[in-house]
Amino acid sequence: MHIEIRKRGKRKLYYLAHSFRHGDKVRKLRRYLGEDLTRNAIELLRQKAEKSILEQASSLRAIRDPLHTILSSKEMELIKALISKGDIRIKHLSEEEWLKFAETFAYNTNAIEGSTITASEARGIIEENEWPPERSKEEISETYGVAETIKYVRKTKEHISLSLMKELHRIVFSNSKAFAGKFRAPGIEVAVTDSHGNIIHKGAPQRQVIAVLRELVEWYKKNRKRYHPIVLAAVVHNQFERIHPFQDGNGRVGRLLLNNILLKHGMPPVNIELKNRQEYYQALRTYENEGNLRPTIELILKEYRELRKLLKRM
């Protein structure tokens, strides 16, 4: 940001100006500070003006929740610019690369939810059927379950449905959870807490779960040809996580749904890494609190770059 001075007769008018890229264009925002100001007055006025400019710039960069608002042409331009810069050029995966992806995805998606199985142990479980003696049978079965669900996602022709959601959950948790493949029963409400026990998210009331899931399915059917696949996948994933239809296991099913949408549109799969867990959670919070999809899109593009690096090392 910088100070601009404009002269009108004998008067000097002071502005705080800020230039930034918005989509494929450069935007400039200004705030009027006053006339004939001293240096101290400029500094005092600058602080408030700077905050105002940053808030406006942030709102301009935001991508609204398409579930409730049709995206504007400027937002569509912004998405196009983000994706073009994201460089997601990844060839279709070979069977060897799919195996590597399944192992990496199974490790990370379970670790995000607290699994203690390491990356090398996940590889041994999936490739060699090796059971680490110090790990629980539940963690081991969920590692198998995620890998099997990746196979299912590759084969199914379904994009999204309530039966698909339940089937993904059933495959992952069939040997670890009694409620595998079943939405929350009456009286079961869920909340997500942080490490201090503070509630950071409450799922939809149990009695509303079926209705809001159907709304999501209908939105996807209506908009599947309107928006870029990454936008579709991000909305489906984020909205699914907001609803939290299962008693447990929503994060893993949500990330599988994310990949299912991408694959059905000819896109490569994406792996949300454990090291990016906080960024992932923050993207979900920003979507829930502000209706801003941009952080989720940026994270997906970031993970595509990481996937390309992983495949190059094979």
Can you annotate each of these PLM segments?
Residues 1-248, 252-314:
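FIC/Doc superfamily catalytic core
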